[in-house]
Design a protein with these regions (language model features):
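N-terminal trafficking/processing presequences and adjacent post-cleavage segments
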Residues: 1-19
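Acidic, low-complexity, intrinsically disordered interaction modules
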Residues: 16-77
C-alpha cells in the first residue's frame, strides 16, 4: 500500500474525512510510514492512526511538518 498526501493544517484545525480530525480520539496502530512533504520534499516518518467516525474505522498517517503544522496522508490501493 502507498500513502498519499491528503491535506495539512494548523494544530487543532484540520478537516479529514469531512470532519475536524482533532475532535476525535486517535488510536495508535503501532505502525510508522515514510512520507514526503509535498511542498519542500523533505522526508518524514509519521505514525499511523485510526479513529472511529460515525461508526466507521478510518486510518491515516499524521505528523508535524513543522511546529503545530500537521500533515495527513491516506492509504491508497495500488
Amino acid at each position: 500500500m502507498a500513502w498519499e498526501y491528503e491535506t495539512f493544517g494548523p494544530d487543532g484545525q484540520c478537516k479529514l474525512f469531512g470532519v475536524n480530525i482533532f475532535n476525535y480520539d486517535w488510536q495508535t496502530t503501532g505502525k510508522r510510514v515514510k512520507v514526503q512533504d509535498p511542498i519542500y520534499h523533505q522526508d518524514h516518518t509519521f505514525e499511523v492512526w485510526q479513529v472511529e467516525i460515525d461508526g466507521k474505522m478510518r486510518r491515516f498517517a499524521a505528523g508535524e511538518f513543522s511546529n503545530c503544522v500537521w500533515g495527513f496522508y491516506l492509504e491508497k490501493n495500488g
